[in-house]
């Protein structure tokens, strides 16, 4: 017998019961994006490797350790996208969407990173991202955060996420801070683990992300990035905080929040949760005013965020299961008798025309009443329609509420109105 071929570790199948949950959550996210004027852009999952090296930074963990990179038959180096912003910027430059224009874009799809699979973090994972180009004030940063806060309210998880903010300033301000941080770390190398010692000279701001408790204790005495901010960045951040205060959005300023990608400047933020065990990031983003020019376009201010959908789905399932308790099928049509199948299918098509969005399944494969009602239960139907030969003859159908057990015969011409009342 041939050996079964299984999915690659860290790359998961999502089965019908799971995809229904994803679709409900994604539909909510997309509706909110539309209400803020965002348009969808669809991007390739494979890009030229230099795109990510230039955008993300060659000495980041993503580029050094996590990218899926390969040569194609022409010898070109290609990479499965590890994130969405770089590809979105590349597309904007290539198609002339950015210079002297305002764009509000969103995308959704799989990303790929070769890291250790764990709950909510996989090698193929899904992100929804939003990017704004052409606006540089703190007001658009605030609106993006307000948009995400509206998501949490719509999903019923507002009480289980919290917002952390920081400003990492301009490129020059970060360079000055980097020098001060390296000088401090050099004086305390005995406390650093090997990973932090390596990062100290390649990307010292990443030391601030260390989970090592000894390093975290040491960093309590380290220089603070906020002390090195340029005046424009400080003014920008103050403006953002005032707008969030006015909107009633609570936040914590986290001076160690720097993000893992090199293209960020000024505003960075994360929505985090403690409701999935250890603290985890649900959504994160910030401003990246230099990236468009860095990738070959004209200088264009930009800000955006990305959200991991696997972690969001887990969070909604954990804290608001009622949101996703939606049946696969609203109505199950039971056809009793050999001569009724054609009439049943005709009635089902008419109801789909008259009730757009209703989830109606017609029984196929025969079976007695008991078997057909068992199938209706399996699919989670709320209502069964029973069509026998006598109902076909007199133009009626029996409508049975599978929760209360009540049933009544209704004329086929008026059954749609009756069903709308039952389904609410």
From Swiss-Prot:
It is an enzyme of class 6 (ligase). PROSITE patterns: AA_TRNA_LIGASE_II (PS50862). It comes from Salmonella paratyphi A (strain ATCC 9150 / SARB42). GO terms for cellular component: cytoplasm. The keyword Nuclease does not apply. Homodimer. This is Histidine--tRNA ligase. Keywords: Aminoacyl-tRNA synthetase, ATP-binding, Cytoplasm, Ligase, Nucleotide-binding, Protein biosynthesis.
């Amino acid at each position: 017998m041939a050996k079964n071929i299984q999915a690659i570790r860290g790359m998961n199948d999502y089965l019908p019961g799971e995809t229904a949950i994803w679709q409900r959550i994604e539909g909510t996210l997309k509706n909110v994006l539309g209400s803020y004027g965002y348009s969808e852009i669809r991007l390739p999952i494979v890009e030229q490797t230099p795109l990510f090296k230039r955008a993300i930074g060659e000495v980041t963990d993503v580029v050094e350790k996590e990218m899926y990179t390969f040569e194609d038959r022409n010898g070109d180096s290609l990479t499965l996208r590890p994130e969405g912003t770089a590809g979105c910027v590349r597309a904007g430059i290539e198609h002339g969407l950015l210079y002297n224009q305002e764009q509000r874009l969103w995308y959704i799809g799989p990303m790929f990173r070769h890291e250790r699979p764990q709950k909510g973090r996989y090698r193929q994972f899904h992100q929804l991202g939003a990017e704004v180009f052409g606006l540089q004030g703190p007001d658009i940063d605030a609106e993006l955060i307000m948009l995400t806060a509206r998501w949490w309210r719509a999903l019923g998880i507002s009480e289980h996420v919290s917002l952390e903010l920081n400003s990492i300033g301009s490129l020059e301000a970060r360079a000055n801070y980097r020098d001060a941080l390296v000088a401090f770390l050099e004086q305390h190398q005995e406390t650093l683990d090997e990973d932090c010692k390596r990062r100290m000279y390649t990307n010292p701001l990443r030391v601030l992300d260390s989970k090592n408790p000894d390093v975290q204790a040491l960093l309590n005495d380290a220089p603070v990035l906020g002390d090195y901010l340029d005046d424009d960045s400080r003014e920008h951040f103050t403006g953002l905080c005032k707008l969030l205060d006015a909107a009633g959005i609570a936040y914590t300023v986290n001076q160690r929040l720097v993000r893992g990608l090199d293209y960020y400047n000024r505003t960075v933020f994360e929505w985090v949760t403690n409701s999935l065990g250890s603290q985890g990031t649900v959504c994160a983003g910030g401003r990246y005013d230099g990236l468009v020019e860095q990738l070959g376009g004209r200088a264009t201010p930009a800000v955006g965020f990305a959200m991991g959908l696997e972690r969001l789905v887990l969070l909604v399932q954990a804290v608001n299961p009622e949101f996703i308790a939606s049946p696969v099928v609203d109505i199950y049509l039971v056809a009793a008798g050999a001569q009724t199948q054609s009439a049943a299918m005709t009635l089902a098509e008419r109801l789909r025309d008259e009730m757009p969005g209703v989830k109606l399944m017609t029984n196929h494969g025969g079976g007695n009443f008991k078997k057909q009602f068992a199938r209706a239960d399996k699919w989670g139907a709320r209502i069964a329609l029973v069509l026998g030969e006598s109902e076909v003859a007199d133009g009626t159908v029996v409508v049975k509420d599978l929760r209360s057990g009540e049933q009544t015969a209704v004329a086929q011409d008026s059954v749609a109105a009756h069903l709308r009342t039952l389904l609410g």
